[in-house]
Each structure stands twice: as structure tokens, then as C-alpha cells.
Amino acid sequence: MSEIHLLKINYNDKDFSFIQDIRKSVFKDELQISEAELFDDFDNSCDHFLIFNGKNVVGSLRIIVMEDKIKLERMAILNEYRAKNYGKLCILQIKEYYSALDFSQMILDSIYSVKDFYKKCGFIEEGDIFQRVGIDHIRMFSKF
């Protein structure tokens, strides 16, 4: 099985440039999302994680800590590292990390076309399909 590790960083860390590059590659270049949509005010206050396989940065994500749950956002695995189980392993590590901090639920707004990936990670659809940045999304949650 593939192994990954996560590195928690903040917005002002020099390594945030990796996150910028990953978001541009995945969201702007692949999904044609406007660069203006890739970064927002939440970036200043949320938890950011780089995803590594060995010394290679393979992806990133951010977590917004809410009152009683966490919200997974902007999870992106670089194209050449997909289909290697990194995303699922990453979610398991995030659940473990935040469970130790007494959180027991994670929510996310999945791009509709990748919702089955999140289902395999234990997420359940909730609510109706909605549009964000011109792409269909669905709210999902997972208790842990």
C-alpha cells in the first residue's frame, strides 16, 4: 500500500507556495476555474496540509475548523499521483488527527463528478446538487 504523510502549515509559511502551485495546476489548469476563485479570506485562518509521498509533494488540502465539525476544502492531488490511494489515505489521517482534537464530523462540498471517491472514504450525500464556480457540487458528511 502507498504511504503518505501530511505536513500542517499556515498561510504565511514559505511552503504555502506549494499549495498555490497545486491549486493552480488542478483547479485552474485542469478544471478551468478562475484563478481569482482559488484563494480567499479563509486561507488566512484555516489549517493547510501538504500531502507527501516520500519527499514528493503530491497534493494539498485545507480544513476549516467550525464549532463542532471540520470542513474539508480544496483537496487536490496532482494528476501524476492520482489512482494511488493517496486521497483516501489522506482523509483517514485527517480524520484521525481531528478525532484526537475531539471533532467527530467532517463535511465537504464535493464536485459532483468525484462524489463516488468520497463515498468510498465513508462520506454520505446530503441535500441537493448546487453550483459553485460553474460546476455541480453536492454536500457530503462523514462521522468518525
Language-model features, listed with the residues they occupy:
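A short beta-loop-alpha structural element at the N-terminal edge
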Residues: 2-19
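Conserved GNAT acetyl-CoA-binding A-motif
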Residues: 98-110
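Conserved acetyl-CoA pyrophosphate-binding loop and the N-cap/start of the following alpha-helix
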Residues: 81, 85-93
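A conserved beta-turn-beta hairpin within the catalytic core of GNAT-like acetyltransferases
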Residues: 65-73, 82, 132-137
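Helix-loop element at the rim of GNAT/NAT acetyltransferase active sites that forms part
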Residues: 9, 21-34
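Conserved catalytic-core motifs of GNAT/GCN5-like acyltransferases
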Residues: 107-109, 119, 124-139
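Conserved beta-hairpin
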Residues: 35, 42-59
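Conserved beta-strand in the GNAT
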Residues: 50, 56-64, 71-76
